[in-house]
Amino acid sequence: QDLEINESDPKKLANIICALEPTFGAVNLEDIKAPDCFEVEKICRSKMNIPVFHDDQHGTAIVVCAAAKNALLVASKQFDDIKIVSTGGGAAGIACLNMLVKLGVKKKNIWLCDINGLVYEGRTTDMNAEKAAFAQKTDLRSLDEVIENADMFLGLSGPNILTSSMIKKMGAKPIIFALANPSPEVMPDIARKAASDAIIATGRSDFPNQVNNVCLLYTSPSPRDRISSR
């Protein structure tokens, strides 16, 4: 069942969802912007006795981490050794990074960039607690600077952000997940030309190696019980 709720305040939205608990066997939160989605999920999980799933976060993270595990096997690398550069500090991006940490990636090896550049200690522009958890203590500020020797690029941001020159700075057998839709951070042919040994995935079904929460969503519990904020 798809239920639309006309409420933009995260606390009020969460309380409405919690009040609906007797109606559903599980809840899938949909299209709630960051950072509000983190608060809504936290409140719902603390108060409800049924599963609470946010596919923008958890669906994407599960598929990304499964794909990353396979990519690392191909590249002969390990989670605890790799440097990851990620673009996009929204719900999907943060959830992916949190799950990658649980799989063994060291936080000190994760470099998060958003529209304002690198997330670093002391930055005040467009920050929240979820981004701050990945803030780096460094003088570097740009994607172009931090991409050097990266083992993996994780893009959940926008089109044409990753350039050929950046890819050439990455490590051997770079893993490039350019997952922005409909236009990825770099097109696969451009990435391949810049690094012939690259392991490349996008969020699109018309390119090889699709990494998208659609690969998981309809196998998750109670896919009919969806709640969206509008």
Language-model regions, residue ranges each:
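Glycine/serine-rich phosphate-binding loop and adjoining beta1-alpha1 elements at the start
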Residues: 1-80
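Short alpha-helices
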Residues: 56-70, 205-220
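Glycine-rich phosphate/diphosphate-binding loop of Rossmann-like nucleotide-binding domains
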Residues: 62-147
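Rossmann-like NAD(P)-binding element
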Residues: 119-179, 185
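Rossmann-fold NAD(P)-binding glycine/threonine-rich loop
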Residues: 180-207, 211
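Single conserved hydrophobic/aromatic residue that forms the stacking wall/gate
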Residues: 218-230
